Amino acid sequence: MANYFNTLNLRQQLAQLGKCRFMSRDEFVDEADYLKGKKVVIIGCGAQGLNQGLNMRDSGLDIAYALRKEAIAEKRPSWRKATENGFRVGTYEELVPEAGLVVNLTPDKQHSAVVQAVQPLMKQGAALGYSHGFNIVEVGEQIRHDITVIMVAPKCPGTEVREEYKRGFGVPTLIAVHPENDPKGEGMTLAKAWAAATGGHRAGVLESSFVAEVKSDLMGEQTILCGMLQAGSLLCFDKMVADGVDPAYAGKLIQFGWETTTEALKQGGITLMMDRLSNSAKLRAYALSEQLKQLMQPLFEKHMDDIITGAFSSGMMADWANGDVKLLGWREETGRSPFENAPQFDGKISEQTYFDHGVLMIAMAKAGVELAFETMTRSGIIAESAYYESLHELPLIANTVARKRLYEMNVVISDTAEYGNYLFANAAVPLLKEAFMGNLQVGDLGKPVADGEIDNARLRDVNEAIRQHPIEIVGAELRGYMKDMKRIAVAN
């Protein structure tokens, strides 16, 4: 199989990278009706598989779970989760032939084996669904021409998908139809119904493409969403301890600081996050972020280039074939890091202290979000897609760090995201150690910035630069559709 994106000519590549349309709410007046009366069979009962299934069932759809025979016989966690929630469970052979829609929600590295197992069992004219297009775009999986191939990609972890639905809302969602597999022209109608069944239509849906979703998703998770959190956590902890800060305090400030400070992004973008700082701290955070952007731009561009060409995917798939030797080695190395093994801090840290003592962390978040967005849009990805794959998801991933530090983040994200995260962090950490961390000042991390004289013109210009960044402009519009989403819990 050949990388699908690389089989396209330049015009086709640009067209698919740039496909992005915010859909109006009146396009979903029929909600999930088109799928009612059809049997929907989900393969995979992880966080996305279970929670999407629960939402779809509550929306009136007929949902069952197809699992491997061994998973059923051995009563593995996937079988237990499905049966404990009252779903019908069966083997591929029992359930797939009757399905109008088969939804593949297994991990990326299992997709080829799963799709090759279920394709011969799917009835003529059925549909195959994904929530991430890696198998189609990067692996180049060939699907039978009578099968419609669609994607519904919620831009949140599975638990959020469920919780927002239970509140009568939903999470922002990308939908797409594979242009090589829409024989009856019903792909978009099917995708809209599936998105509505998960509640996504209440929070905003982007009509995208498999290509745009995959390339932007890979870029976001490798750089700002996971890689920057990993690199920033390791660097900031080591810096504070070297400066004499109690390791327990440093560990807590970082573990919960990402979550607390980036919560402001969800409510009001980079503007609000920076507005939580004093004027002196804001000016310092802005200056640090500009230095970071200049240093890291080539690294962000390298990741984007490797994603576009397929070099990243081919390297990762080679590691799959080699038993995940690199991935598992990097995971073990992270587990041995001083930050992961820092003692617990029993004292309380106020919400504002996370901002006041975390100026460098805020600068890192700002620089990473803006660089990821800028790099994606310069590569042909539309601003709305770039926003969802950078700023929007950052507080959600930061929330996983708050649970059990980097271990939890790397458990929750996909193996694909974890592999890319390590690639980025392994390059970013030595780069910033050598060229940046040694130039920090007192007040950048672990202590507040001292108040000083403020130049009104300078403050005016910085405020204007923050507010007029393109991600702030598109973000203000998109957040308008998400204003009812619940606030992520902030530690104290």
UniProtKB/Swiss-Prot annotation:
Q: Which residues bind Mg(2+) 2?
A: 217, 389, 393
Per its Swiss-Prot or TrEMBL entry, what cofactor is needed?
Answer: Mg(2+)
What's its top-level EC category? oxidoreductase
The reaction(s) annotated as catalysed by this protein in its Swiss-Prot or TrEMBL entry are: (2R)-2,3-dihydroxy-3-methylbutanoate + NADP(+) = (2S)-2-acetolactate + NADPH + H(+); (2R,3R)-2,3-dihydroxy-3-methylpentanoate + NADP(+) = (S)-2-ethyl-2-hydroxy-3-oxobutanoate + NADPH + H(+)
- Using the record's annotation, list all stretches that form the KARI C-terminal knotted domain: 209-344, 345-485
Record GO cellular component, one term: cytosol
Query: Can you tell me which residues form the catalytic site?
Result: 132
The residues the record assigns to binding NADP(+) are 45-48, 68, 76, 78, 108-110, 158
Which Enzyme Commission number(s) are listed?
Answer: 1.1.1.86
Annotated positions binding substrate? 414
Recite the UniProt keywords alphabetically.
Answer: Amino-acid biosynthesis, Branched-chain amino acid biosynthesis, Magnesium, Metal-binding, NADP, Oxidoreductase, Repeat
What InterPro entries does this protein's entry cite? 6-PGluconate_DH-like_C_sf, 6PGD_dom2, KARI, KARI_C, KARI_N, NAD(P)-bd_dom_sf
User: What's an example of a GO molecular-function annotation for this chain?
Assistant: magnesium ion binding
Q: Where is the KARI N-terminal Rossmann domain?
A: 15-208
Member of which family?
A: Belongs to the ketol-acid reductoisomerase family.
Q: What does this protein do?
A: Involved in the biosynthesis of branched-chain amino acids (BCAA). Catalyzes an alkyl-migration followed by a ketol-acid reduction of (S)-2-acetolactate (S2AL) to yield (R)-2,3-dihydroxy-isovalerate. In the isomerase reaction, S2AL is rearranged via a Mg-dependent methyl migration to produce 3-hydroxy-3-methyl-2-ketobutyrate (HMKB). In the reductase reaction, this 2-ketoacid undergoes a metal-dependent reduction by NADPH to yield (R)-2,3-dihydroxy-isovalerate.
Stated name of the protein: Ketol-acid reductoisomerase (NADP(+))
Provide the species name.
Sodalis glossinidius (strain morsitans)
- Organism lineage: Bacteria, Pseudomonadati, Pseudomonadota, Gammaproteobacteria, Enterobacterales
